[in-house]
Amino acid sequence: MAEAGVAAASLFGADRRLCSADILPPAEVRARIEVAVLNFLAALTDPAAPAISALPLISRGAANRGLRRALLRDDVSSVYLSYASCKRSLTRANDAKAFVRVWKVMEMCYKILGEGKLVTLRELFYTLLSESPTYFTCQRHVNQTVQDVVSLLRCTRQSLGIMASSRGALIGRLVLQGPEEEHVDCSILGPSGHAITGDLNVLSKLIFSSDARYIIVVEKDAIFQRLAEDRIYSHLPCILITAKGYPDLATRFILHRLSQTYPNMPIFALVDWNPAGLAILCTYKYGSISMGLESYRYACNVKWLGLRGDDLQLIPQSAYQELKPRDLQIAKSLLSSKFLQDKHRAELTLMLETGKRAEIEALYSHGFDFLGKYVARKIVQGDYI
């Protein structure tokens, strides 16, 4: 009953293979939580049902993942989850705590939404740690359980009242107009740029004005600040954006909004030449596996500008580094995925064959002003994949 009652609440268009998470108002999310509770209680009182009902969740395992491929060259491909399910059961030893965690998080979300508040994952962790220390001993427990709740209720994380913890920033040829009519001219800011709020509701209401021709996604904050300090956007009409490492939800959200507002503005990624850099690019391009139910909402058609294998001739041998065990682990995961395109796979294979990795900073061997020239040259020459 729980599976039918909650799962039937949302369908993803006409494609029944794809399962999605809806953007919902607080009242609707609270109603879905109430339905889940009622279904669970009904199962407990049904003589024909098992003594303890299991929670039906959409599986995030590899067998249930797929890639919705773009039909046209400039369209966006994205990761999706199909309808294969898994269960959290109180009767299985390995699942018992995870089963309880789902109810604890739903209880907390019900309270948060009733109070009209938003909390970060970190705030949620410390609250649950103080109230239920037996079940929540690390941040990972909260992160995984939130995705379980998203899977059960089929609503987005933001709809649960959980706000993204944004590290992101942007700068360049862009003016932001907020809901209170305030304007931010991102072309006159210091090299740290404009901090991206974690509140997706605020980001969804921003009005953009731009004469840029390109968007450049930068992996590292230090590289972002170098390009901003050089004011690359003064001679190359562009917007710079960074998540300062692995892309957080808010940075992906605003990048997607920019791509929707300016569909003819190409997006380029500047990442390290290592498996982690490619993984970051793929998250922007296809979405996150862990958030498969809502990944399609944030996927963008991102091109790989650099670093790439063709750029290694610009880097001195002394700047190469050995691949680390973590690099090999990421590479293995990427190679086994369904979405890695051929040219990306070739780059990853070259990394493994050479056993080397290189960071963008290695280009500083040509001087600090070389980076901006490198980026501009590659864009103008169409040197990206």
Curated annotation (Swiss-Prot):
Keyword Cell inner membrane (UniProt): no
Listed EC numbers: 5.6.2.2
Pfam families tied to this protein: TOP6A-Spo11_Toprim, TP6A_N
PANTHER family reported in the protein's UniProt record: MEIOTIC RECOMBINATION PROTEIN SPO11
Domain Topo IIA-type catalytic per the UniProt entry, residue ranges: 24-169
Record organism: Oryza sativa subsp. indica (Rice)
Protein name: Meiotic recombination protein SPO11-2
Single Gene Ontology BP annotation: meiotic DNA double-strand break processing
Induction pattern: By auxin and benzylaminopurine.
Gene Ontology molecular functions: ATP binding; DNA binding; DNA topoisomerase type II (double strand cut, ATP-hydrolyzing) activity; hydrolase activity; metal ion binding
Assembly mode: Interacts with TOP6B.
Enzyme class: isomerase
Binding site for Mg(2+): E219, D272
GO cellular component, one term: nuclear chromosome
Function: Required for meiotic recombination. Mediates DNA cleavage that forms the double-strand breaks (DSB) that initiate meiotic recombination.
Tissue and organ expression note: Highly expressed in flowers before pollination. Expressed in roots and shoots.
Reactions accelerated catalytically: ATP-dependent breakage, passage and rejoining of double-stranded DNA
PROSITE patterns xref list: TOPO_IIB (PS52041)
Cofactor: Mg(2+)
Family recorded in the similarity comment: Belongs to the TOP6A family.
Record localization: Nucleus
Active-site positions on this chain: Y126 (o-(5'-phospho-dna)-tyrosine intermediate)
InterPro entries to which the protein is assigned, alphabetical: Spo11/TopoVI_A, Spo11/TopoVI_A_N, Spo11/TopoVI_A_sf, TOPRIM_Topo6A/Spo11, WH-like_DNA-bd_sf
